[in-house]
Design a protein with these regions (language model features):
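C-terminal accessory extensions appended to soluble enzyme cores
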Residues: 174-206
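Conserved catalytic-core segment of NTP-binding enzymes
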Residues: 50-147
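Walker A/P-loop NTP-binding active-site region of P-loop NTPases
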Residues: 1-24
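Switch II (G3) loop of P-loop NTPases
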Residues: 37-56
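Short, glycine/acidic-enriched loop or turn micro-motifs at the edges of active sites
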Residues: 9, 46, 108
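Beta-strand-loop-alpha "switch" segments that mediate conformational coupling across diverse proteins
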Residues: 121-181
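Phosphate/oxyanion-binding active-site loops and adjacent basic polyanion-contact surfaces
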Residues: 23, 45-49, 78-83, 193
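Glycine-rich, highly charged phosphate/nucleotide-binding loops
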Residues: 20-31, 51-56
Length: 206
């Protein structure tokens, strides 16, 4: 199950996955659902984090229902500072360092060069796990998937040979041929991105 806590980000719902939208102030309802669920992902919007953590503090040991707190960070200075604040907030309410995992998002080439503030902070405070191998590299696929409303999984499962369609249908309309060309390219991108995501997952939860 995926729970989106007032997330203003492009959540899984925008990629065709079923998402349970919830308000941050309804933490007790979320806690009950977590207790009843075997597997769940909670996507907390930045603007809802403080209220979410407040609700967690009010229900004793509720954080025990959450195995990991995964924090994605982008390289801009503001994003890094917000991530540091989030790690500090989690540490202050007693979340163990090994449960706080940082994912470096939209990496251009080198995590150490692009995320110095986060890396230096975690190295000093030792209150989270920040492995430079947990890096999702910048790729145009994510925007394209959002626009088409499909997931990487659905794209990879699509067995259509779009290259063959282009080759074998020279009289098809320009619109059809353009669509087939797009899909062929997206499938190639998806294979590369999927390898990257599998590697990040293995790094985070090894």
């Amino acid at each position: 199950e995926i729970f989106a806590i007032e997330s203003v980000n492009e959540t899984a719902a925008g990629l065709g996955l079923e998402v349970d939208q919830m308000a941050a102030k309804k933490f007790r309802d979320l806690h009950k659902k977590l207790v009843l669920s075997d597997n769940a992902i909670i996507d907390v919007g930045n603007g809802s984090l403080e209220q979410f953590l407040s609700g967690m503090v009010q229900i004793d040991e509720s954080h025990e229902e959450i195995d990991f707190f995964v924090i994605p960070v982008e390289s801009d200075t503001k994003g890094q500072k917000e991530t540091i604040k989030t790690v500090m907030a989690l540490a202050e309410i007693g979340i163990e360092p090994q449960k706080i995992r940082i994912v470096f998002n939209k990496v251009e080439s080198d995590v150490a060069d692009e995320f110095p503030h986060v890396l230096n902070y975690v190295k000093k405070e030792k209150n989270a796990i920040a492995d430079v191998k947990a890096a999702i590299f910048e790729n145009e696929l994510f925007d394209a998937l959002g626009a088409k409303g499909i997931t990487i999984g659905a794209l990879l499962a699509d067995e259509t040979d779009y290259k063959a369609l282009i080759k074998n249908n020279p009289d098809a309309s320009a619109k059809e041929r353009s669509h087939w060309g797009d899909m062929h390219g997206l499938k190639a991108l998806a294979r590369s991105v999927n390898r990257n995501l599998d590697s990040v997952f293995s790094t985070l939860f090894k």
